[in-house]
């Protein structure tokens, strides 16, 4: 299950195999979670954008004794009553980097073409236009998923 506020990202998630998606601009995540999990919540919630609202959404929608993994690098302060973590006996993990093995496995996956990673590439720039690529990303209106900078032929 994938939640987002951008339809294009939800469509991309479906292309990669997500069996359920919810646009939280149009539907309450809590309502969707209750319907999807029969009121139990999710065993694992992965917060990938770093926004306080999405972290709080993970806490609210995690199952009893659920796991929350934070990979989004947030810059804003998050305030909440921590007793919900205790009452639900949640496990919260932070992850900033990957292991060398993870990079090797991902390189092998891309090389095998088992997963078409190019579906998520919105634009390709040559190295000499790398500054334009970073500007496009800095001014992203939500339509860009990933940008690829091509080095060499």
Where are these regions (language model features)?
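Glycine-rich phosphate-binding loop and adjacent beta-alpha segment
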Residues: 51-112, 150-153
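Adenosine-nucleotide cofactor-binding segment
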Residues: 1-57
């Amino acid at each position: 299950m994938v939640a987002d506020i951008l339809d294009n990202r939800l469509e991309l998630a479906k292309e990669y195999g997500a069996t359920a998606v919810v646009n939280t601009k149009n539907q309450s995540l809590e309502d969707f979670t209750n319907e999807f999990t029969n009121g139990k919540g999710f065993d694992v919630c992965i917060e990938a954008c770093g926004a306080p609202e999405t972290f709080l959404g993970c806490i609210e929608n995690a199952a009893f004794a659920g796991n929350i993994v934070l990979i989004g690098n947030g810059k804003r302060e998050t305030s909440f009553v921590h007793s919900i973590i205790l009452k639900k006996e949640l496990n919260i993990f932070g992850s900033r980097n990957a292991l060398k093995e993870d990079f090797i496995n991902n390189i092998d996956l891309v090389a095998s073409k088992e997963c078409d990673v190019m579906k998520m590439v919105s634009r390709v720039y040559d190295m000499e236009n790398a500054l334009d690529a970073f500007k496009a990303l800095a001014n992203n209106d939500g339509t860009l998923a990933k940008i690829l900078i091509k080095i060499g032929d």
